[in-house]
């Protein structure tokens, strides 16, 4: 069984929990996910099965879409509601829609972001959250991220008694973007502490929330012997590459990992044979031909 299953992850589950559940439902060990979702976040989590585990990295290269909320007036250790409050600062009056929209627009494009301490980013061989849990501090590397669109989705709510304002947003972003940190950075524009107070992932890996199954849906599909109707071809992970259908002669070369003498069209090409993408080949400027980059060899 090879393919991708877009799962709608429930809140309260880790991404690893979902992988373990899918392994049990499908009775196979070769299962992986393409991008961690925190337990408090729900939404799209593409699950790769069988040979599709070879294309996880390419799924992660697709953009992601989230919707959620930012609350101004306090901050936490984790940049969301799961952490301990470390700073409070009441708002005397709410930000205007003009202020909100101008700042969201200013936070689009190519940005520099410092990942949160409670994250899986590795520094000196250890994950940042391991340092955080041990009470240690470490310099975090700056990373370049891309935010394609960042908009307000409904009127904000101002709680005058608490001195807090909640802003509702939708964001489209590239790989490696921490939405929690976007929330904190939004508050920083106004000299205010902030947290990400809610988040759902609407799209990831080329899949939208409307295409996703719950774990119960997957279990039902198995029981009704219709798994083939819900598992997406691994080709979905390779939509960003130029796909070339190869001849029988070329297939004999490719299936044995040989080089292809083709004029360069793209740096990386996806080779299709017998209706399936069988391999990714990369152009070698020294050899002046295409060489294997990733072998899939789907039957």
Curated annotation (Swiss-Prot):
Enumerate the InterPro entries for this protein.
PsdUridine_synth_cat_dom_sf (IPR020103), PsdUridine_synth_N (IPR002501), tRNA_psdUridine_synth_TruB (IPR014780), TruB_C (IPR032819)
Q: Which GO terms describe its molecular function?
A: RNA binding; tRNA pseudouridine(55) synthase activity
Name the chain's protein.
Answer: tRNA pseudouridine synthase B
Q: Which UniProt keywords apply?
A: Isomerase, tRNA processing
Q: What is its EC number?
A: 5.4.99.25
Top EC category: isomerase
Active site per database record: 38
In its UniProt entry, the species of origin is given as Pediococcus pentosaceus (strain ATCC 25745 / CCUG 21536 / LMG 10740 / 183-1w)
* Gene Ontology annotations of biological process type: mRNA pseudouridine synthesis; tRNA pseudouridine synthesis
UniProt keyword annotation of Isomerase present: yes
Task: Cite a single Pfam family from the UniProt record.
Answer: TruB_C_2
The family this protein is said to belong to: Belongs to the pseudouridine synthase TruB family. Type 1 subfamily.
Q: Which reactions appear under catalytic activity for this entry? A: uridine(55) in tRNA = pseudouridine(55) in tRNA
Protein's job = Responsible for synthesis of pseudouridine from uracil-55 in the psi GC loop of transfer RNAs.
């Amino acid at each position: 069984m090879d393919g991708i299953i877009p799962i709608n992850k429930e809140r309260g589950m880790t991404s690893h929990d979902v992988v373990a559940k899918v392994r049990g439902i499908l009775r196979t060990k070769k299962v992986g996910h393409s991008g961690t979702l925190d337990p408090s976040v729900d939404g799209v989590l593409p699950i790769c099965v069988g040979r599709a585990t070879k294309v996880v990295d390419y799924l992660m290269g697709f953009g992601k879409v989230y919707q959620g909320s930012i609350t101004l007036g306090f901050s936490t250790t984790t940049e969301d509601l799961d952490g301990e409050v470390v700073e409070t600062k009441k708002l005397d009056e709410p930000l205007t829609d003009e202020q909100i929209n101008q700042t969201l627009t200013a936070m689009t494009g190519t940005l520099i972001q410092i990942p949160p301490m409670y994250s899986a980013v590795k520094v000196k061989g250890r994950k940042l959250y391991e340092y955080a849990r041990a009470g240690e501090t470490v310099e975090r590397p700056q990373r370049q991220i891309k935010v394609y669109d960042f908009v307000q989705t409904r009127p904000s709510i101002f709680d005058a008694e608490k001195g807090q304002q909640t802003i509702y947003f939708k964001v489209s972003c590239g790989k490696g973007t921490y939405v929690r940190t976007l929330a904190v950075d939004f508050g920083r524009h106004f000299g205010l502490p902030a947290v990400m107070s809610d988040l759902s992932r609407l799209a990831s890996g080329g899949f939208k929330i409307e295409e996703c199954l719950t774990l119960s849906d997957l279990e039902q599909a198995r029981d009704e012997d219709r798994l083939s109707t819900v598992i997406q071809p691994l080709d979905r992970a390779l939509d960003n590459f130029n796909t070339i259908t190869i001849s029988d002669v070329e297939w004999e070369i490719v299936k044995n990992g040989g080089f292809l003498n083709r004029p360069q069209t793209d740096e990386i090409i996806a080779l299709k044979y017998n209706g399936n993408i069988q391999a990714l080949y990369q152009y070698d400027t020294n050899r002046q031909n295409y060489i294997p980059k990733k072998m899939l060899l789907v039957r």
